[in-house]
């Protein structure tokens, strides 16, 4: 269903996953300050890329596996104010890594597939967008390891129940957790989404704990709606540059 924001329009009619609060939260919160190049892995309709273009002056490359979604993405890019800074490439991230072995980005953003197993959706493209079969955590982290600039950061949004699976394999790819946002859908509820900001493990700032070196991780919390059903002040401040009615 087409979705109109303050400065751009998103047509996701051919895309497996529609515009979501998850995407808006990640696009609004990701720390993009001073990023000159941004990579959007699994771009879908291009929402994250368009939000990044509005928030920065970066050159943005979007990678999307599904051809129909890539067509939506290209259409949305062409209709935006920032078309000269946006490009969409239709391929999987592994193929892109092989083709662009020397290229690196200041920031990587990704709203990855989040169902590791379970029944597939009746619509194949929606199933592909929702299941990690199309982009495993190992494949994602390998791509981040290769494509992220030495001082760059990668921002991902995941369901809380999937976070430990990803965190457990970060060290395998010499990546570390730098920052975490715990997001609850409603005030008083447990966080059901987390944004993880990753970086290369450069052994910069450490805390020693029982002989094991641990990196200090900044952590924030946010709830999207108050108990009344209205958007919280924190989410309103984050998203007011994008949503029409805020």
From Swiss-Prot:
Protein name (Swiss-Prot/TrEMBL): tRNA1(Val) (adenine(37)-N6)-methyltransferase
GO biological process: tRNA processing
EC number assigned by the record: 2.1.1.223
Family designation: Belongs to the methyltransferase superfamily. tRNA (adenine-N(6)-)-methyltransferase family.
Alphabetized Gene3D superfamilies for the sequence: Vaccinia Virus protein VP39 (3.40.50.150)
Subcellular location: Cytoplasm
Primary localization: cytoplasm
Gene Ontology cellular component terms for the protein in this record: cytoplasm
Keyword set, alphabetical order: Cytoplasm, Methyltransferase, S-adenosyl-L-methionine, Transferase, tRNA processing
Organism from which the protein derives: Shewanella halifaxensis (strain HAW-EB4)
Reaction catalysed by this enzyme: adenosine(37) in tRNA1(Val) + S-adenosyl-L-methionine = N(6)-methyladenosine(37) in tRNA1(Val) + S-adenosyl-L-homocysteine + H(+)
Function: Specifically methylates the adenine in position 37 of tRNA(1)(Val) (anticodon cmo5UAC).
Domain of life: Bacteria
Pfam families: MTS (PF05175)
An example Gene Ontology molecular-function term: tRNA (adenine-N6)-methyltransferase activity
């Amino acid at each position: 269903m087409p979705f109109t924001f303050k400065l751009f329009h998103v047509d996701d009619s051919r895309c497996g996953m529609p515009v979501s609060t998850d995407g808006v939260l990640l696009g609004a919160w990701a720390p993009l300050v001073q990023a000159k190049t941004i990579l959007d892995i699994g771009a879908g309709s291009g929402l994250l890329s368009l939000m990044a273009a509005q928030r920065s002056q970066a050159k943005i490359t979007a990678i999307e596996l599904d051809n129909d979604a890539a067509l939506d993405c290209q259409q949305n890019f062409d209709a935006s104010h920032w078309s000269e800074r946006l490009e969409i490439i239709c391929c999987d991230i592994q193929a892109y890594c092989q083709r662009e072995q020397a290229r690196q980005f200041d920031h990587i953003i990704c709203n990855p597939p989040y169902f590791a197993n379970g029944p597939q959706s009746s619509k194949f493209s929606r199933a592909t967008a929702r299941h990690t079969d199309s982009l495993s955590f190992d494949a994602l982290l390998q791509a981040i390891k290769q494509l992220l600039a030495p001082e760059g950061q990668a921002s991902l949004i995941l369901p809380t129940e999937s976070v430990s699976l990803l965190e457990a394999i970060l060290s395998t790819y010499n990546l570390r957790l730098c920052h975490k946002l715990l997001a609850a859908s409603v005030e008083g509820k447990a966080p059901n989404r987390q944004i993880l900001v990753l970086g290369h493990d450069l052994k910069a700032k450490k805390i020693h704990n029982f002989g094991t070196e641990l990196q200090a991780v900044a952590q924030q919390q946010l709830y999207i709606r108050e108990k009344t059903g209205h958007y919280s002040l924190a989410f309103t401040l984050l998203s007011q540059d994008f949503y029409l009615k805020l």
